[in-house]
C-alpha cells in the first residue's frame, strides 16, 4: 500500500520489489517455494505447481543499472522495497559488483544504492492477520486488490498448518529486520501497517517529510486493503487452533 502511494506522488521514486526475482527463473518466489520442506499434501495440494522460468543472464552491473533506472523519478529519488527473505538474493547479486567494500548487507546496499539511504520499516503488529492474507494470496496468486474486495468464492481454502507455516516465516522476517537495525545502529522511520490502513494519506505524508519532500503530495489511497469478512473469520478460527496446538500468533 505504501509503495503505491509513494509511486503516485511522482517524486518519491518508483518503488517496487526489485530484489524479489530469482536469477534461475527471473520470477518472484512461487507459492510452493514458500513451502519448501513442507510434506503435508493437505497444504501442498492447494498450491499451484511450479512454473518454469528463464535464467537471468545480466551481469551484476547491468542488474544494478537497470534497477536504479527503473526505481528513480526525474528528481533523482530512488525507491524500492526489500523483504528479509530477499536479502540473500541481494547479497548474491551484489557479490558480482567490482570493488566491493564488504560482503555484508550494509555494504551491499551502499554499493548498489549509494550511502544516502533513508530506511523505512513497515511492520504489522498482528502476524496472524498478515499470515492469513498471505495464505489466501499464495492460493489465489492475487496479491493486491485495487478495485473490488476478494470474491467470496475465490477458491482459497482454510488450512491452519499453511497459515502457521507462513506465520513462522513472517515472524522470523520481522525479527531479522529488527536485529539488523539494532546491529547496524540504525533508527529507521517506523510505519505501522495499522496506521497505514487507517490513514494512508497521513502516513504517506509522514514518509514524504522524512525524505525532505512536500507532504501535500501524498495522494488518496490507490489500493484497497486485501481483507474482508472471510479473512477475519479465518484469523479468529486460527487463533483458537493456535491456542490448542501451539501455532505461532
Which residue stretches match the model-derived regions?
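Membrane-proximal basic amphipathic "stem/tether" segments
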Residues: 36-45, 95-97, 103, 233-249
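PAPS-dependent sulfotransferase catalytic domain
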Residues: 74-179, 188, 201-216
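A structural micro-motif
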Residues: 10-12, 117, 186
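Hydrophobic, Leu/Ile/Phe/Ala-enriched alpha-helical segments that form helix-helix packing faces
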Residues: 6, 10, 67-70, 108-112, ...
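Glycine-rich, flexible loop/turn motifs
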Residues: 14, 127, 219
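PAPS-dependent sulfotransferase catalytic core
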Residues: 1-74, 225-234
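The conserved 3'-phosphoadenosine-5'-phosphosulfate
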Residues: 20-30, 146-164, 179-249
Amino acid at each position: 500500500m505504501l509503495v503505491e502511494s509513494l509511486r503516485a506522488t511522482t517524486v518519491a521514486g518508483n518503488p517496487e520489489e526489485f530484489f524479489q526475482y530469482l536469477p534461475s527463473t527471473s520470477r518472484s518466489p512461487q507459492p510452493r517455494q514458500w513451502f519448501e520442506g513442507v510434506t503435508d499434501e493437505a497444504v501442498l495440494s492447494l498450491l499451484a505447481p511450479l512454473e518454469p522460468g528463464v535464467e537471468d543472464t545480466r551481469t551484476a552491473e547491468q542488474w544494478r543499472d537497470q534497477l536504479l533506472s527503473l526505481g528513480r523519478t526525474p528528481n533523482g529519488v530512488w525507491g524500492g522495497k526489500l523483504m528479509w527473505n530477499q536479502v540473500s538474493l541481494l547479497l548474491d547479486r551484489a557479490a558480482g559488483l567490482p570493488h566491493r567494500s564488504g560482503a555484508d548487507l550494509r555494504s551491499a546496499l551502499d554499493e548498489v544504492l549509494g550511502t544516502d539511504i533513508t530506511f523505512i520499516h513497515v511492520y504489522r503488529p498482528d502476524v496472524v492477520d498478515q499470515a492469513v492474507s498471505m495464505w489466501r494470496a499464495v492460493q489465489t496468486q492475487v496479491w493486491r486488490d485495487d478495485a473490488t474486495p476478494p470474491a467470496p468464492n475465490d477458491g482459497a481454502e482454510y488450512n491452519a498448518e499453511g497459515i502457521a507455516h507462513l506465520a513462522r516465516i513472517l515472524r522470523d522476517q520481522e525479527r531479522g529486520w529488527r536485529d539488523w537495525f539494532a546491529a547496524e545502529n540504525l533508527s529507521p522511520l517506523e510505519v505501522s501497517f495499522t496506521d497505514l490502513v487507517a490513514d494512508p494519506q497521513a502516513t504517506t505524508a509522514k514518509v514524504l517529510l522524512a525524505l525532505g519532500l512536500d507532504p501535500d503530495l501524498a495522494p488518496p489511497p490507490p489500493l484497497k486493503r486485501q481483507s474482508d469478512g472471510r479473512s477475519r473469520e479465518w484469523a479468529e478460527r486460527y487463533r483458537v487452533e493456535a491456542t490448542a496446538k501451539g501455532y505461532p500468533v
